[in-house]
Amino acid sequence: MHKLPSGCGRVLKAGRTVCVMDRVNEIRSTEDMGVRPYFRLTDAQMRAKQRPEEAIFIAEGPKVVKTALERGLKPLSFLMRRKMIEGAGADILAMSPVTPVYTGDDDILEAVTGFRLQRSWVLSAMARPEEKTPEEVLRCARRVAVLEGIWEPSNVGAIFRTAAALGWDAILLSPDCSDPWHRRSVRVCMGSVFTVPFARTGEDSGIGLLGALGFDTCGMALREDSVSPDDPTLRKAERLAVFLGNEDHGLKDATLRGCRRVIRIPMAREIDSLNVAAAAAIALWELRPGRG
């Protein structure tokens, strides 16, 4: 790894000059230690369950990285194309003036990340915030989405974005749900994971705790004893939790037995189900805060 020439690449931020090139490192190989978070670490290693203080995630894209920085998340490094450093990425670097920056030829960067580079391309390895407990995120919540066994990161990300846009207060995730900090999930949600409080549940997907806290619990499923999500009694519920199930098998039988009601979206043309992210968007819209 090589340092680029110093004394150049300065940008003006809030009336002060910030040197960029003094902290830019040129990578020559995927073996360079500085790019290990972007290439060598598996999702499980990024979670670092044994040492939570070392857990990281990857923010991708200028908007997502900026949102993370504005929310106070701690960047450990940046990885970006050379033209971004003094171009569109300059504002990002000025927001974190001492964080190391890594760059290199496009073929090296593509080998590191495993995908083709876009024009405005930037990644940042960031420290994960401390995890919250279900009790913490539910304390003042009135509308909660519960994700059970949803394994596709893009679906998790899409649901986070919908929940943020429609004003839902919190999200709970079962132990077998995809990690909300997965790079693809963070990208799809456009940083909503930074703004919507969330927590992992126990094996019961939190249904016991939600019931004890007075939530009206509703599971989405293809059952005859269901109601539409625009049901007036659901809209008027003071505290409501909507359970969304696995892409292939839906909610567990035990979860549905624990739910007070079952929701089913009416459909036409002999279509019986939607992608879980699409179904979530409809249900969360119909049951959004203040709709009753």
Describe each PLM feature range:
Residues 15-84, 178:
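Boundary-proximal intrinsically disordered activation/regulatory segments immediately upstream
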Residues 20, 70, 101-103, 126-225, ...:
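RNA substrate-binding interface of SAM-dependent RNA methyltransferases
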Residues 27, 57, 148-149, 174-175, ...:
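Glycine- and other small-residue-rich loops at beta-strand/loop junctions that grip anionic moieties
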Residues 61, 151-159, 274-279:
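Amphipathic alpha-helical repeat scaffolds
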Residues 87-98, 255:
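Short, aromatic/basic amphipathic alpha-helical patches
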Residues 97-114:
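A glycine-rich helix N-cap at a beta->alpha junction
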Residues 121-123, 162-166, 180-192, 253-292:
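Structured adenosyl-cofactor binding patch, chiefly the S-adenosyl-L-methionine
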Residues 219-271:
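Active-site/ligand-binding-proximal alpha/beta "capping" segment
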